[in-house]
């Protein structure tokens, strides 16, 4: 499930082991987050296309526009279409929002939507291609968040001609989850960093367009469950910043579609699929899961490792099915 790095790594190993492999992708273009989430300046699309074409030549079958859980269910794949095993690697791509007033205004995006539009609609080739979204050109852009996705979004906005591009983060720079080099590159390119601030309301005009964001300054209290000190609002510190584009990079969670349409598939309290840490087997026989849909947001390297681990487990599972069939045939003959 899903043509992301986790499933591509799994597919590559399984096809080499001699199995027939089909990969289902919900979108119209293959590659998952490698294509629609990571900007062109960090990972050129031609590299991903090359790797996918290598898998095609080796016999992997790719199907696009297949939304598992809607177009087809897991049970239909196994019971009706005859697949012996299923590997779920759909990632954790459901964006989190701030749940503050004004998020409906034109010009307010989730980082997922913003980067997907930029990548799949080739806006990164601006000005050769028109921007297929509320224009960043000559506008003030604010990105809320401090992770790698926030850095991708703010640097993309600059490449789309933004007049200014700023990171607004509720803790200090030291607590930012983004890699140090990503922060360094953003600063080198002219991104402004505003820390210990938190948006509390988006403001707009009578036409429904974003015009500003109201923020409050923060102090740091006791550490929370992440080990970082919790931001605490400072009374009377409200201020308003003009902006016409705001991008929310506040993290992601698991899309519940597959979990809700697959009876017998165990999930965690946070909605991720529960899988054995060593084998990646789920509570449903023949169904395996790995990557962000199990662990939550992680790195590309960990995702690839999960795919290769799943391939080994699936291979062992399929060999056990073959042994059971041979044993049944032997008993029948006797």
Predicted regions and their residues:
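Beta1-alpha1 glycine-rich phosphate/pyrophosphate-binding loop at the start
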Residues: 1-70, 96-103, 113, 150-196, ...
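Hydrophobic, well-ordered secondary-structure elements that form the walls
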Residues: 186, 247, 307
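Feature captures the FAD/FMN-dependent oxidoreductase FAD-binding
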Residues: 1, 6, 49-100, 201-214, ...
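Short glycine-/acidic-enriched loop or helix-start segments at secondary-structure transitions
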Residues: 10, 73-74, 97-99, 120, ...
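FAD-site-proximal beta/loop scaffold in flavoenzymes
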Residues: 104-138, 223-297
């Amino acid at each position: 499930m899903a043509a992301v790095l986790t499933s591509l790594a799994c597919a590559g190993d399984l096809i080499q082991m001699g199995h027939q492999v089909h990969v289902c992708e919900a979108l119209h273009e293959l590659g998952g987050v490698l294509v629609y989430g990571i900007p062109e300046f960090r990972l050129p699309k031609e590299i991903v296309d090359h790797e996918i074409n290598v898998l095609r030549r080796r016999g992997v079958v790719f199907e696009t526009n297949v939304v598992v859980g809607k177009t087809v269910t897991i049970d239909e794949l196994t019971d009706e279409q005859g697949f012996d095993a299923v590997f779920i690697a759909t990632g954790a791509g459901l964006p989190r929002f701030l749940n503050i007033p004004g998020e409906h205004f034109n010009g307010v995006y989730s980082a997922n939507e913003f980067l997907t539009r930029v990548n799949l609609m080739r806006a990164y080739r601006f000005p050769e291609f028109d921007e297929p979204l509320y224009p960043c050109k000559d506008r003030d852009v604010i990105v809320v968040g401090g992770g790698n996705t926030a850095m991708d979004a703010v640097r993309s906005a600059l490449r789309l001609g933004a007049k200014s591009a700023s990171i607004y983060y509720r803790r200090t720079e030291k607590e930012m989850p983004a890699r140090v080099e990503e922060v360094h590159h953003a600063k080198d390119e002219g991104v402004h960093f505003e820390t210990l601030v938190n948006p509390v309301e988006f403001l707009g005009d009578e036409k429904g367009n974003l015009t500003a964001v109201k923020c409050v300054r923060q102090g740091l209290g006791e550490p929370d469950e992440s080990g970082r000190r919790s931001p605490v609002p400072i009374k009377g510190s409200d201020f308003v910043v003009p902006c016409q584009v705001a991008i929310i990079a506040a993290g992601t969670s698991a899309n519940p579609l597959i979990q809700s349409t697959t009876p017998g598939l165990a999930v965690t309290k946070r909605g991720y699929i529960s899988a054995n840490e060593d084998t990646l087997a789920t509570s449903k026989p023949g169904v395996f899961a790995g990557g962000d849909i199990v662990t939550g947001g992680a790195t590309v390297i960990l995702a690839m490792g999960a795919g290769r681990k799943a391939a080994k487990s699936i291979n062992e599972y399929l060999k056990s099915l073959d042994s059971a069939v041979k044993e049944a045939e032997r008993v029948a003959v006797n």
